[in-house]
């Protein structure tokens, strides 16, 4: 039996679920399809810092999505908590950036994007062991706790009537007259009016397998990231710290997350002893107090990397009813709300708040 659908979203990570929320709020009927469990890939594995690493070194197209998303997060988090009863732990604890050789560029970016900054006070540095270089304190930068945000979002969407189909592999796709006509899976077949591809690191593989003759092939590659979690006490660290390309993130319950590696390992998600050792050494050197606490978790995820870090958001040029929201690399959470709204604007033919040209598929 084949089901007619309004909108089918392929991929149940943060991008897929936030896109579903935007489309649902506009009155559309949405179904999310995933080959595994909802929210179990890169979205679950990330650290949850709601700011890119050194955003002033990133393309403006990233900052545009970031700043718009930051405006949305407080209300979004409260709405999800109120409706689902699950706290996403949006938490504006602030972030210390230890090394800023390009301090003027950093300050210019903060001023132009209305992000508060201060010279880091000495009292903030005394318990840390690193070579500081014009340390910068960003007092308003927040975090979210990825697994709880995803669980809260799924519960909210379920309550709102969004359908989830999990552990369903796609076995066939029929293209007819510039449209993705039907999709067959191991569970059921569908004929969607619109299909949205939010498959993260698997997006390019999906397109190569099912749409090999189309005029574009997106460059989204899996980039493995490994993280550690220390079972620390709540008074160990009050704020996030970025030192070079690694960071510490204190959760509200006291646990401290250490990230992260950036590895070209294909679709291999296994953790490694070398990464565990490197992350442990970084964390205990920077914050010696961590030596007294055990590691309680070590995991890996696959980020959807693009050449510039800019995601692909928009319609496929060859198929009138296929759109894509993927390729956010390390910034899926922090760019997620604005990315979802941008794609919803395009699908619903609303005037976008953000110029879509930089994210178009080409």
Walk through the language-model features, giving the residues of each.
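Glycine-rich FAD pyrophosphate-binding loop
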Residues: 24-45
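N-terminal Rossmann-like FAD-binding beta1-loop-alpha1 element of flavoenzymes
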Residues: 5-31
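C-terminal catalytic lobe of FAD-dependent flavoproteins
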Residues: 289-362
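Active-site substrate-recognition segment that forms the wall
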Residues: 18-26, 48-50, 87-91, 194-320
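Short beta-strand to alpha-helix junction loop
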Residues: 64-67, 100-103, 136-155, 270-275, ...
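Dinucleotide-binding Rossmann-like beta1-alpha1 core, especially the glycine-rich loop
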Residues: 49-126, 132-133, 282-284
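Short hydrophobic core segments
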Residues: 8-10, 190-202, 340
């Amino acid at each position: 039996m084949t089901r007619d659908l309004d909108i089918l979203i392929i991929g149940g990570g943060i991008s897929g679920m936030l896109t579903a929320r935007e489309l649902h709020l506009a009155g559309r009927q949405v179904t999310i399809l995933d080959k595994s469990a909802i929210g179990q890939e890169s979205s679950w594995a990330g650290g949850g810092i709601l700011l890119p690493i050194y955003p002033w070194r990133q393309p403006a197209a990233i900052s545009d999505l970031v700043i718009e998303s930051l405006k949305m997060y407080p209300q979004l988090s409260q709405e999800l908590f109120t409706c689902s009863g699950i706290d996403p732990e949006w938490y504006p604890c602030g972030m210390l950036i230890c090394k800023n050789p390009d301090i003027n560029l950093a300050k210019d970016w903060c001023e132009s994007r209305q992000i508060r900054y201060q010279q880091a006070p000495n009292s903030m540095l005394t318990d840390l062991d690193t070579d500081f270089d014009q340390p910068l304190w960003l007092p308003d930068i927040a975090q979210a706790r990825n697994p709880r945000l995803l669980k809260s979002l799924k519960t909210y969407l379920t309550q709102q009537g969004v359908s989830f189909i999990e552990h369903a592999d796609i076995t066939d796709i029929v293209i007819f007259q510039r449209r993705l006509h039907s999709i067959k899976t191991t569970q059921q077949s569908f004929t969607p009016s619109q299909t949205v591809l939010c498959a993260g690191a698997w997006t390019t593989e999906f397109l190569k397998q099912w749409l090999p003759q189309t005029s574009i092939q997106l460059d989204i590659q899996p980039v493995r990231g490994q993280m550690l979690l220390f079972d620390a006490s709540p008074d160990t660290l009050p704020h996030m710290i970025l030192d070079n390309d690694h960071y510490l993130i204190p959760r509200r319950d006291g646990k401290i997350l250490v990230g992260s590696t950036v590895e070209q390992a294909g679709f291999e998600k296994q953790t490694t002893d070398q990464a565990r050792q490197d992350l442990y050494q970084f964390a205990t050197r920077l914050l010696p107090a961590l030596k007294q606490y055990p590691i309680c978790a070590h995991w890996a995820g696959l980020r959807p990397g693009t050449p510039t870090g800019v995601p692909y958001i928009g319609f496929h040029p060859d198929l009138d009813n296929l759109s894509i929201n993927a390729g956010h690399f390390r910034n899926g959470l922090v760019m997620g709300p604005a990315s979802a709204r941008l794609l919803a604007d395009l699908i619903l033919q609303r005037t976008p708040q953000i110029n879509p040209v930089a994210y178009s598929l080409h």
